[in-house]
Structures are given as structure tokens and as C-alpha cells.
Amino acid sequence: LIAGLPLYRLSEIFEDVRTLAGYNAGEIQLESLKLLPGTEMRRRAEELGIRYSPLPPYEVLQTNEISVNELQTARQLSRLLDGFYNTTAWQAITRKLILDDNDFLRRFLEFLIDKNLIDQPMSLEKRGLVLYEFCSMHYPAYKIMVTIAWIEAGMSLKKKPAEKVKTKRQMPPEYWEVIYGNYKESLRLCFLPIDDNTQNGYWFGFESEIQKAEPVFKAKGIMERCQNTQSPQINTDKSS
């Protein structure tokens, strides 16, 4: 996406981001238009209503359709996309929020600006903490997804996004639906409940013998056995 193109409004940029997210784009790049010397668009800049910087990199400053402040918003939106959507760990939850709520991008952008974070370099962990804080305030139903992303990114289970995770002496349930990996008794389990039913939630298994922060096993606990579910004991026998 290119902000500053003739006839291209800020509202359309937000719409196009949502469209690309709907197509499961691996990355969404948003850049500012630059009018390089010798190009046709630079020669027609006045005709097209484009004002641009006379100094390199010759970025567009304003058009008939997008103001100086709106171009600044587009630049900040680009930062948001790079930090969250274009980062594997946070892409799935960011995509879901973009698609589920038309106002998410503007609300999250406003949050990052108010916190003076939009132009600050943030570690992977910091971005997860920020996203969890934001969802806790504005999208509490999505906190569980942020926590799952946090765990699968190998983040600390002692930090706020993992506040609901149970780690001590966790034993597998009678039945679960395996999402990935193979269960074995040597795995260190943690459990993320999704409601008051202690069996309803997600199980993650970590290798105890190797220094690997990411889980190697994931399953969803269920109340009774049905198709596509396994007993941990049966699965253990197969993998031992």
C-alpha cells in the first residue's frame, strides 16, 4: 500500500489493510509515495494536487485527498503493522482483531500513540505485553488468544499475559484433542483454562531436557471422548 497516491484517502488505506488481512496476507507493507526526479508523477505533481518535499527522499507531504496529519497517521499505521501484523508471533491475533472489529486499528493506534510507544523500538516481549494490556482494557474476550500467542512464542510464563496459566504439578486430563506434537510423560505441562470448568482449556507441553522456550505439544482438553480425541495414556504408549 502506498500513502500519498492521487485520489487515495486515509479511510481507504484502513479499508485496504482490512482487505489484505482478509486474504491472509503474510505481510502488509504501507509506505509513503516518493516523487523521484525525472518521473512522470513528479512532472504532473501540480496537476495532480501533490505537494512533496524538495529534499531526498522526496516524500509526498500532502494531496487533495490526504492531509499532512493524515499522512502522519498513515506512517504510524505502518509502524503498527510492522510491529504486530508483520511479526509472526502476533500476526494471528492481530489479524483476527482487524477482521472482527472495523475500529480496532484506529483504537489500537490511538492507544500506542497515547502511551508514546508508536515510534519506540519494542522487543517481541514488550509488544506482547502491550497487546495484552490493550485487549484487557478494550477487548477482554480476546485475552485468551493473546495468552496462547504469548505461550507459543516462548515468552515467560511468569509475566502478565500468562497470569491464568497453571504450571505446578499439572496432570493431563482423561481426554484431549491433540492440535500438534506428540505427548510423552517427560513433557512439562502447563494448562490454560478458558472457563470455570477446570478441564476446558488448552494444554501445552515443554521439553524438560532441552533449553527450548516454545512448546512442542498442544492439545485442547475436553469433557468426554469423541472422534479425533485421544487419551494421554494411549498416546503415551505410542510415543514411548
Language-model features: locations:
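A structural motif corresponding to the C-terminal lobe/cap of the Radical SAM core domain
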Residues: 1-102
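Radical SAM enzyme core and accessory elements
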Residues: 79-240
